[in-house]
């Protein structure tokens, strides 16, 4: 069994034979359902892009836990400069296997910076752990190539999709992404953290209809797969 816990905003904790964090923005996150010090036993930390609400506490948690940070090559180098005692693995889109976990870094339509300088390209991740396939979209707009993710790496057991609009897809666009990805389940994320990304997950659920099971998680709740 694999458990996918929503930590608020776009942060998730995946637990199976390995323990994986994605975009661990906890400090300063008004939705946060955990603290960095809660993760002393983590194997991998996946970071989709350099914005502070995604890179978050990745470096500090890696220090605490000894976890490896996986990120776009440029971002991995940036993290290594700030946290010289942390192991990073740089990628540049494509599949790999790290400690028995199959990971595909895939494109996302967004930006990636520290607020001043651009730091590599944004990404999403497809993770296969214990025969469960999870897609975390990162911050992105909908794009047709999402069909390829389903074709190459599907069936996708659960897709974690932003629905807040303004910086990412809104509910309508995310519902279209569900059509392209064909996941069995979908969890909305990246909404209602702050007013600019206000969205109604029930409206998203209505728009998705019977194309997938929409699971609306509150921060701290988990989905068992």
UniProtKB/Swiss-Prot annotation:
Pfam families named in the record: Lactamase_B_3
InterPro entries in UniProt: Metallo-B-lactamas, RibonucZ/Hydroxyglut_hydro, UPF0173, UPF0173_UPF0282_UlaG_hydrolase
Top-level taxon of origin: Archaea
Keywords, alphabetical: Hydrolase
GO terms for MF: hydrolase activity
Similarity section: Belongs to the UPF0173 family.
Protein name: UPF0173 metal-dependent hydrolase PH1671
């Amino acid at each position: 069994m694999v458990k996918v816990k929503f930590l608020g905003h776009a942060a998730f904790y995946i637990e199976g034979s390995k323990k994986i964090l994605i975009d661990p923005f906890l400090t300063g996150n008004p939705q946060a359902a955990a603290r960095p010090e809660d993760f002393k036993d983590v194997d991998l930390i996946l970071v989709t892009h350099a914005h502070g609400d995604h890179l978050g506490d990745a470096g500090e948690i890696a220090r605490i836990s000894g976890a490896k940070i996986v990120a776009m090559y440029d971002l991995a180098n940036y993290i290594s400069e700030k946290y010289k005692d942390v192991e990073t693995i740089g990628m540049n889109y494509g599949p790999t296997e790290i400690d028995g976990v199959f990971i595909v870094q895939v494109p996302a339509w967004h930006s990636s910076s520290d607020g001043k300088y651009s730091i590599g390209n944004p990404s999403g991740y497809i993770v296969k752990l214990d025969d469960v396939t999870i897609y975390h979209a990162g911050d992105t707009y909908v794009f047709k190539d999402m069909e390829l993710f389903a074709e190459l790496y599907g069936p996708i057991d659960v897709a974690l999709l932003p629905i807040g609009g303004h910086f990412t897809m809104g509910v309508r666009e995310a519902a279209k992404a569900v059509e392209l990805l064909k996941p069995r389940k979908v969890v909305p994320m990246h909404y209602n953290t702050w007013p600019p990304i206000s969205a109604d997950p029930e409206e998203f659920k209505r728009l998705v209809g019977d194309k997938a099971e929409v699971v609306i998680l509150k921060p701290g709740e988990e989905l068992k797969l």
